[in-house]
From Swiss-Prot:
Residues 1-21 form the signal peptide. This is Endoglucanase 3. It comes from Arabidopsis thaliana. Keywords: Carbohydrate metabolism, Cell wall biogenesis/degradation, Cellulose degradation, Glycoprotein, Glycosidase, Hydrolase, Polysaccharide degradation, Secreted, Signal. One of its GO terms (cellular component) is extracellular region. It is an enzyme of class 3 (hydrolase). The lineage of its organism: Eukaryota, Viridiplantae, Streptophyta, Embryophyta, Tracheophyta.
Length: 484
């Protein structure tokens, strides 16, 4: 008879056997990818579906005599920050690699979203030898204005890192994005895939050879917006892990070993990549029985134990409504990223029929899946507010999101420029945004499950590319496994 102190972790409160109807995950998946069209910078194609957006940033890079058009605006502003953009690209690519077979026609839409970013990241990496461009736009000037990206007249300052002003973090994240995406395109566009991988190797070598945090090199241009708070070791591990998966080159195995263990976080985000790297590297230990990566398998499981609510080592708070609550500012970014890791590690466990322990609790794959599903469902409307935090999904969703293009009249409605200050009248109104940024996931409710839906409350009402990117994988998983 089993010890009374040893029990199977069932997460009964979060069981899949629930009393509510599951959301339409397939619809949410489609809309989560459509969102990226609303964030596009550059010349828009003829098949642009969010028609209220127009081409913008067509001279980006000109101040440095290079072409840096394209890519994505990170959130509700008109700045291109490559650090979170590259993470967005890596997570979209990981979603496609792990769940592509479950995505149906959305796999091609995912590739389109990825390529919009990688075309730009390639420009940033290849435009000037010995230099990596890492952003366009003056965030301090941009944030003082409320204007459409099509009209922006704030400085389009170009930022870069180099051997004398290093940025191992942003370089390694860029390498991760290029390496991960190279696998996405390996069969459908081999030539493009080879270019991505070759560039990833060069950028990763740059990150390794010239050590330093980009926050120190660029200071107020990236801080406090996207400071590298966790340092750059996590990105070196993350980047090397992706190069290893893309190449299987022993060089990256040895480099990963040289880095040793890392922090034991209870978070995963555009800044802190440790948990993501652990899960990615654990894949080799779980699926291939590769002892070189057993350390990271243990680290991945320690991370899961910090997330599961009834685990003895849990350090994660949950709202009364069941939502993970990590930090007040844009909490859903952590929810979607962690949910991706839960779903993906459970996938690895299921394929090999593995379990692990959190103290005396035996963790089975469905414990992770049940928690993942609860988070996905909460975001999609199964919550105390009965509100979907994905714009345009269901009838009750955020109507006043903190997003310049969405909140201002489109060019079709008002062709003349509003100027830097002309848009603040729209910013201050209680009217719903005139343009629906379909699929955007906002920062989310507070710790009391409350969401005021106020445009000036950017910590809760601002969407961001990295919130959506991590959500694509879990949506694809549940869309494919949902019972009719």
């Amino acid at each position: 008879m089993a010890s009374p102190f040893f029990f199977v972790f069932l997460l009964s409160a979060l069981s899949l056997e629930n009393t509510y109807a599951s959301p339409n995950y397939r619809e949410a998946l489609s809309k989560s990818l459509l969102f990226f069209q609303g964030q596009r910078s550059g010349r828009l194609p003829s098949d642009q579906q969010l028609s209220w957006r127009s081409s913008s940033g067509l001279s980006d890079g000109s101040s440095a005599h290079v072409d840096l058009t394209g890519g994505y605006y990170d959130a509700g502003d008109n700045v291109k920050f490559n650090f979170p953009m590259a993470f967005t690209t890596t997570m979209l690519s990981w979603s496609s690699l792990e769940y592509g077979k479950k995505m149906g026609p959305e796999l091609q839409n995912s590739r389109v979203a990825i390529r919009w970013a990688t075309d730009y990241l390639l420009k940033c990496a290849r435009a000037t030898p010995g230099k990596l461009y890492v952003g366009v736009g003056d965030p301090n000037g941009d944030h003082k204005c409320w204007e459409r990206p099509e009209d922006m007249d704030t400085p389009r300052t170009v930022y870069s890192v180099s051997p004398s002003n290093p940025g191992s973090d942003v370089a390694a994240e860029t390498a991760a994005a290029l390496a991960a995406s190279s696998m996405v395109f390996r069969k459908v566009d081999p030539k493009y895939s080879r270019l991505l991988l070759a560039t990833a190797k060069k950028v990763m070598q740059f990150a390794i050879q010239y050590r330093g945090a980009y926050s120190n090199s660029l200071s107020s241009s990236v801080c406090p917006f996207y400071c590298s708070y966790s340092g750059y070791k996590d990105e070196l591990l993350w980047g090397a892990a992706w190069l290893h998966r893309a190449t299987n080159d022993p060089y990256y195995t040895n480099f990963i070993k040289s880095l040793g263990g890392g922090d034991q976080p209870d978070i995963f985000s555009w800044d802190n990549k440790y948990a993501g790297a652990y899960v990615l590297l654990s894949r080799r230990a779980v699926l291939n029985k590769d002892n070189n990566f057993e350390l990271y398998k243990q680290a991945a499981e320690n991370f899961m134990c910090k997330i599961l609510p009834n685990s003895p080592s849990s350090s994660t708070k949950y709202t009364k409504g069941g939502l993970m609550y990590k930090l007040p500012q844009s909490n859903l970014q952590y929810v979607t990223s962690i949910t991706f890791l839960l779903t993906t590690y459970a996938k690895y466990m299921k394929s090999t029929k593995q379990t692990f322990n959190c103290g005396n609790s035996l963790i089975v794959p469905n414990a992770l899946i049940n928690l993942s599903k609860r988070q996905v469902d909460y975001v999609l409307g199964v919550n105390p507010m009965k509100m979907s935090y994905m714009v345009g999904f269901s009838s009750n969703f955020p109507k006043r999101i903190h997003h310049r293009g969405s909140s201002l009249p489109s060019r079709a409605v008002r062709s003349n420029s509003l100027g830097c200050n002309g848009g603040f009248q729209s910013f201050r109104t209680q009217n719903p945004n005139p343009n629906i940024l379909t699929g955007a996931i906002v920062g989310g409710p507070n710790q009391n499950d409350e969401y005021p839906d106020q445009r000036d409350d950017y910590t809760r009402s601002e969407p961001a590319t990295y919130i959506n990117a991590a959500f694509v994988g879990p949506l694809a998983y549940f869309a494919a496994s949902r019972s009719p």
